[in-house]
């Protein structure tokens, strides 16, 4: 039987912890990982987080750039030979307007539905998202709405060791990103998204966008 343990932290807080399989992840943690990726990837305001400086983005080479937050979020995606992190960054660069980097375009993702995780097998889950990306052209430009309906497949990975006190801000951010012990291993179109948002698009001129192409999903 799994044990329940009482733990008191050095700051005096008390927690009750339950013993779980090392591949177990709480459903809300899984959902929050997907939500975090989407918010960091698609919420652009042209400013480096925590500063008032313009976000010049991260250079991917060949004149391609992504926002700083999108670059950080990409570390939630599986990399290496079996991963598709670089491919996602390339696609994101293709749809990121250059005017984002001088503060003339802003973007916001509005998530209207995020499913409870469905376990595919031990340590792997799928989550469906129905969302709308809103591009705001400044000053006084026409706003554009773009449907973003996706199925995310995630798997449990090793939880990283805490960072030392002298670690850089980027190292600390990456640790926080990976501290849930999850990574995204597949992103595909959620075909059920239209049923979820039925009636939502009438008269809005919302268009579909497929940034995650079939050659690497």
Describe each model-derived feature in a short phrase.
Residues 39-47:
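Sec-exported extracytoplasmic/periplasmic mature domains
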């Amino acid at each position: 039987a799994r044990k329940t343990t009482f733990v008191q932290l050095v700051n005096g807080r008390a927690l009750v912890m339950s013993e779980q399989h090392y591949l177990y992840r709480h459903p809300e943690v899984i959902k929050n990982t997907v939500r975090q990726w989407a918010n960091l990837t698609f919420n652009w305001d042209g400013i480096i987080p925590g500063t008032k400086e313009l976000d010049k983005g991260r250079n991917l080479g060949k004149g391609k750039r992504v926002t700083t937050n999108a670059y950080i979020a990409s570390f939630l995606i599986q990399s290496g030979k079996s991963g598709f992190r670089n491919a996602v960054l390339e696609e994101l660069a293709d749809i990121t307007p250059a005017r984002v980097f001088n503060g003339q375009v802003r973007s916001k993702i509005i998530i209207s539905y995020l499913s409870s995780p469905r376990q595919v097998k031990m340590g792997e889950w799928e989550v469906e998202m129905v969302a709308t990306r809103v591009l705001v052209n400044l000053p006084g430009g026409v706003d554009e709405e773009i449907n973003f309906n996706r199925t995310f497949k995630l798997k449990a990975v090793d939880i990283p060791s805490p960072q030392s006190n002298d670690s850089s801000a980027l190292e600390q951010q990456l640790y926080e990103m990976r501290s849930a012990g999850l990574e995204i291993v597949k992103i595909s179109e959620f075909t059920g998204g239209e049923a979820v948002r039925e009636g939502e698009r009438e008269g809005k001129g919302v268009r579909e966008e497929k940034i995650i192409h079939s050659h690497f999903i």
